Amino acid sequence: MRPTWKALSHPAWPEEKNKQILVLGLDGAGKTSVLHSLASNRVQHSVAPTQGFHAVCINTEDSQMEFLEIGGSKPFRSYWEMYLSKGLLLIFVVDSADHSRLPEAKKYLHQLIAANPVLPLVVFANKQDLEAAYHITDIHEALALSEVGNDRKMFLFGTYLTKNGSEIPSTMQDAKDLIAQLAADVQ
């Protein structure tokens, strides 16, 4: 009988586990700014959109969380589903003030979550400080979040990042705490 690869693997080598928190959303939604702000507890605006992949580790009192942001422009969206299977949870960032792109964001979000019906989902309705921003109840409706499934943990946060260098708003801290708890629960 031929041994399987698993039998040949070294016992000290850990099996590959889902360990990254994916940060996805259309280009211009504010994913990088949100991620940097979560990491540093300070508002840090990003100017250029992510071209490719951006990984960030955030330490909490109890653990270390690995975030993987994948660019939101069309050439990079094809990678989203490939990495989804390796994710602990999905953070999906939308620009609350960009009304014309919400149907596109909804389409991609629903394609992603259809592939994994139990993957926890955290939606950031970003740029809530802008005058044109939809309220989170409007974002909930525009993204059809009531259709994400009963087996999935889903959370929606209205977020904004104001002055560069200032402390992150309490909503962002609450979101960070929740993400840490969700990640710990899934692992």
Swiss-Prot record:
One of its GO terms (molecular function) is GTP binding. GTP binds at residues 25-32, 69-73, 126-129. Keywords: GTP-binding, Nucleotide-binding. Gene3D superfamilies: P-loop containing nucleotide triphosphate hydrolases. Pfam families: Arf. Belongs to the small GTPase superfamily. Arf family. This is ADP-ribosylation factor-like protein 9.
